[in-house]
């Protein structure tokens, strides 16, 4: 069965553009069939983005290396670029259709094309390490894959003052993954809202 996390898509392409307002800014994204949350910005990602903005703003952060890990069509990184224009934002994604969309959306945000990386996990990210990483994991891949992605994301944190942001729904096993994150990292809940938990994790 084909999923949005498959490398190639067999579903007929039918691109759309959708727009929405977020924290006083308007955003438009190009999307398509067979990608995650194709018709609208998903609630979990928007909740995590709000928490990231508040976390960075409270600390006076303006720049740094940020990875939108398993980026889909680039929702998280593109929005953050608007609020933190000096942030150096990268994207990684395995699904080629989503990757093409990410290139379009990132280009509209003046993000360089070579910052969008086709990669299964961290396999093609190379020697880059990041100050901040976001992950809304592809839950339907199963726990083994999700845990692998979490660990791989953590391995790309630059140092003990670098942070991994994750969002997982209660119905998707947030409690179980919270225990996993706490076992592997220094991990704390940032917020829980409308069935989604956002956590902040760093190296122990």
Protein language model features and the residues they cover:
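A short SAM/SAH-binding and catalytic strip from SAM-dependent methyltransferases
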Residues: 131-144
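Conserved SAM/SAH cofactor-binding pocket of Class I
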Residues: 44-126, 132-135
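N-terminal auxiliary segments of SAM/dcSAM-dependent transferases
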Residues: 1-23, 34-38
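Conserved class I S-adenosyl-L-methionine
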Residues: 169-184
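A short glycine-rich, Lys/Arg-flanked "PGG" loop and its adjoining helix->strand segment in the class I
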Residues: 147-160
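Short beta->alpha hinge that forms the Motif I/post-I loop of the SAM-binding pocket
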Residues: 93-97, 145, 169
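Conserved beta-strand signature within the Rossmann-like core of class I S-adenosyl-L-methionine
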Residues: 161-168
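Core SAM-dependent methyltransferase catalytic element
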Residues: 192-204
């Amino acid at each position: 069965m084909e999923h949005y996390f498959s490398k190639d898509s067999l579903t007929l392409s039918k691109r759309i553009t959708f727009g929405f307002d977020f924290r006083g800014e308007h955003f438009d994204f190009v999307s398509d069939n067979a990608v995650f949350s194709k018709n609208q910005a998903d609630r979990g990602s928007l909740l995590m983005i709000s928490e990231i903005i508040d976390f960075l703003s409270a600390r006076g952060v303006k720049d740094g290396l940020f990875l939108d890990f398993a980026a889909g069509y680039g929702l998280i990184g593109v929005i953050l670029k608007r609020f933190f224009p000096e942030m150096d934002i990268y994207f990684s994604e395995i699904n080629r259709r989503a990757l093409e969309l990410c290139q379009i959306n990132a280009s509209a945000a003046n993000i360089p094309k070579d910052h969008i990386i086709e990669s299964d996990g961290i396999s093609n990210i190379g020697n880059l390490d990041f100050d901040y990483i976001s992950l809304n994991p592809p839950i339907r891949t199963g726990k083994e894959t999700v845990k692998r992605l979490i660990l791989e994301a953590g391995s790309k944190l630059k140092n003990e003052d670098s942070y991994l942001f994750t969002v997982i729904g209660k119905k998707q096993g947030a409690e179980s993954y919270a225990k996993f994150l706490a076992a592997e990292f220094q991990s704390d809940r940032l917020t829980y809202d409308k069935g989604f938990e956002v956590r902040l994790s760093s190296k122990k």
